[in-house]
From Swiss-Prot:
Family in the record: Belongs to the RNase H family.
Pfam families: RNase_H
Entry keyword set: Cytoplasm, Endonuclease, Hydrolase, Magnesium, Metal-binding, Nuclease
Listed GO biological process terms: DNA replication, removal of RNA primer
Name of the protein described by the UniProt record: Ribonuclease H
Coiled-coil segments on the chain, per record: none
Functional note: Endonuclease that specifically degrades the RNA of RNA-DNA hybrids.
Cofactor(s) for this UniProt protein: Mg(2+)
GO terms under cellular component: cytoplasm
Subunit structure: Monomer.
Length: 146
């Protein structure tokens, strides 16, 4: 039977662009795993995406995933058909401009083919303890490298 994993992700940037960090929390049953990372020159959107990518890469086998993010950019691209349209249009937006962050979107395409991922939007910086923990991990990743 396919495992269902719950993942919370968040990204942060000190300046946008600037130093960035990402954090993710993976939960399965009573098991919790926290991961985080840093980039010296990035954007907030890239860190939001990187959190999701690294969390999905951490899974050891194909899983069903409930992924929670406060990034409208990430969640809307997945749930409102933006990504499908970009693929169909050769990585061009509706206004015929190149899609930003193509490298990361291509990684997300690969990972969402391997795993069955449902994306959920959560309100950032509110009372969601898991999202708040991911925000803390992302900010700590920046602080530890500064």
């Amino acid at each position: 039977m396919e495992k269902t994993i719950t993942i919370y992700t968040d990204g942060a940037c000190s300046g946008n662009p600037g130093k960035g960090g990402w954090g993710a929390l993976l939960m399965y049953g009573n098991t919790r795993k926290e991961i985080s990372g840093y980039d010296p020159a990035t954007t907030n959107n890239r860190m939001e995406m990187m959190a999701a990518i690294r969390a999905l890469e951490a899974l050891k086998e194909p899983c069903r995933v409930e992924l929670y993010s406060d990034s409208a950019y990430l969640v809307n691209a997945m749930n409102q058909g933006w990504l499908k349209r970009w693929l169909k249009n050769g990585w061009k937006t509706a206004s015929k401009k190149p899609v930003e962050n193509i490298d990361l979107w291509q990684e997300i395409v690969k990972l969402t083919t391997l795993h069955r991922v449902t994306f959920h939007k959560v309100k950032g910086h509110s009372d969601n303890q898991y999202n708040n923990r991911c925000d803390e991990l992302a900010r700590l990743a920046i602080k530890e490298q500064s």
